């Protein structure tokens, strides 16, 4: 365990609460001390929804520490059952309250006897998994609970009857997901074009009573690696349902996704051929393929970029940059360190290096050393980019409220490909833009911090050298500063004068 003031993925209970609060009429009770109860505030601030967050905190206070939690937890469960009348109550401790080592299973069993709704304890090890892994496990646990319940009651006997027309489930659309609502809308449109019905979307907006119908679909779609694969594997094991793990992000991967659907339907006796649809969308409907061959996009060829985010988005954006737009990806990385083997296999051929870490300082230093023309990452990489004066496009959670847009901004499908191309192109500094702003004045005339993220307090710039540095065009000033400081350190200098600047320029050949 280590102290951190920044985490890419939150603690396990956040993942459990994200999944539970995505379902309709499901309430969560968090057994936690004050301080762990920030999920309500975070979700209310970020998610653009009208409803209150259905989470109650059963506070671990001095009385609980003295007398135990059983009476309080059971009372809160029974009270919420009466007040809210939910279909399900999910009980979860946090990593802090788990230290008490209380028998929450016993509390849940006792509460179930006095409650009309179902009560489930989240089956998550709060010390071993993070938010994403816990969300994946919680979704699978809830699905398994209701399918098992349906089997016991006789509502589900053997393999369920398939829908008359080809249909699918979409697994993994959740609260606080990165552009999830927009991606769902785009996926629905894509499936409608392919004449495929939608059976269920889980967990977002789903009723737990409908989960017994999951097996009626012909196949499952898992758009994100972070949430849904465990449920897809369980449904495959339980009902023999095939599933698609290809993320339809970018023109090439969207075509692969559609061909995978075609293969699954052909294997189930439906002779479909989607090649004409793929060609029409790629060549005439989507603007992404055309734009990638335009003069504007060719200006980006060979430019350097770095990518960091969750496995799904970082891998997809890396492939789009390298394969579809000809941009040189210096390194790509993910904070999903448990998924390193898959990430390496996916993007190893599209970038020079791979960085798997949860340490934001390592990411920041890697960005400073690479000196890319653009960054594609999370909100933390955007902060780093501002300090280094490098533009950043946000492509993955964790994110600020401005990345929960009101307007339609999908990342999946053909419209998503258009949005991504816009994001990538607009993230690069175009030509002499910064330099012209400095020459003619304007909104960007403020003084900018060029300080490297590495410690450089040992070097002093003379007033003349600083004035000379300020004459350098803004889009290369940071690089000139770093090269000069590197030159000075290698020679043991503590002060940078104009002479040192020119010597460094000569040494670096620029």
From Swiss-Prot:
EC main group: oxidoreductase
Sorted UniProt keywords: 4Fe-4S, ATP-binding, Chlorophyll biosynthesis, Iron, Iron-sulfur, Metal-binding, Nucleotide-binding, Oxidoreductase, Photosynthesis
Free-text remark on how the cofactor is bound: Binds 1 [4Fe-4S] cluster per heterodimer. The cluster is bound at the heterodimer interface by residues from both subunits.
Domain of life: Bacteria
HAMAP family in alphabetical order: ChlB_BchB
Homology family: Belongs to the ChlB/BchB/BchZ family.
The protein, known as: Light-independent protochlorophyllide reductase subunit B
Species for this entry: Synechococcus sp. (strain JA-2-3B'a(2-13)) (Cyanobacteria bacterium Yellowstone B-Prime)
């Amino acid at each position: 365990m280590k102290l951190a003031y920044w985490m890419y993925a939150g603690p396990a209970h956040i993942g459990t609460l994200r999944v539970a609060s995505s379902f309709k009429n499901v309430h969560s009770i968090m057994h936690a001390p004050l301080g762990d109860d920030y999920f309500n505030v975070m979700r209310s601030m970020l998610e653009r929804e009208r409803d209150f967050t259905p989470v109650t905190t059963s506070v671990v206070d001095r009385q609980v520490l003295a007398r135990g939690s059983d009476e309080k937890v059971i009372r809160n469960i029974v009270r919420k059952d009466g007040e809210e009348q939910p279909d399900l109550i999910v009980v979860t401790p946090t990593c802090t309250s788990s230290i008490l080592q209380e028998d929450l299973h016993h509390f849940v069993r006792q509460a179930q006897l006095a409650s009309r709704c179902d009560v489930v304890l989240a089956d998550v090890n709060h010390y071993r998994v993070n938010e994403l892994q816990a969300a994946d496990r919680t979704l699978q646990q809830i699905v398994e609970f209701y399918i098992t319940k349906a089997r016991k009651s006789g509502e589900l006997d053997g393999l369920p009857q398939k829908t008359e027309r080809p249909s699918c489930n979409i697994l993994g659309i959740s609260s606080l997901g990165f552009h999830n609502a927009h991606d769902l809308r785009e996926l629905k449109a894509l499936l409608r074009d392919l004449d495929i019905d939608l059976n269920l979307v889980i967990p977002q907006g789903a009723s737990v009573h409908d989960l017994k119908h999951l097996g009626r679909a012909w196949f499952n779609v898992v758009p994100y690696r972070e949430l849904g694969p465990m449920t897809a594997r369980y449904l495959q094991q339980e009902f023999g349902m095939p599933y698609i793990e290809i993320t339809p992000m970018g023109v090439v991967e969207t075509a692969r996704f559609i061909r995978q659907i075609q293969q699954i339907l052909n294997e189930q006796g439906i002779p479909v051929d989607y090649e004409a649809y793929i060609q029409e969308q790629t060549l005439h409907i989507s603007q992404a393929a055309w734009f990638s061959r335009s003069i504007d996009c060719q200006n980006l060829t060979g430019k350097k970029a770095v990518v960091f985010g969750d496995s799904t988005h970082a891998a997809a954006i890396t492939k789009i940059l390298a394969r579809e737009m000809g941009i040189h990806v210096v390194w790509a990385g993910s904070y999903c360190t448990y998924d390193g083997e898959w990430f390496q296999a996916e993007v190893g051929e599209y970038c020079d290096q791979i960085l798997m870490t949860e340490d934001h300082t390592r990411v920041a230093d890697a960005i400073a050393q690479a000196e890319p023309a653009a960054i594609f990452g999370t909100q933390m990489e955007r902060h780093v980019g501002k300090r280094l004066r490098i533009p950043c496009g946000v492509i993955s959670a964790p994110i600020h409220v401005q990345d929960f847009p009101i307007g339609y901004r999908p990342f999946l499908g053909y419209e998503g490909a258009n949005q991504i191309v816009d994001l990538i192109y607009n993230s690069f500094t175009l030509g002499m833009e910064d330099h012209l702003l400095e020459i003619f004045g304007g909104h960007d005339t403020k003084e900018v911090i060029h300080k490297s993220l590495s410690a450089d307090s040992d070097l002093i710039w003379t007033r003349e050298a600083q004035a000379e540095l300020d004459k350098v065009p803004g889009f290369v000033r940071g690089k000139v500063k770093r090269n000069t400081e590197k030159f000075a350190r290698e020679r043991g200098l503590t002060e940078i004068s104009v002479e040192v600047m020119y010597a460094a320029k000569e040494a670096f050949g620029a």
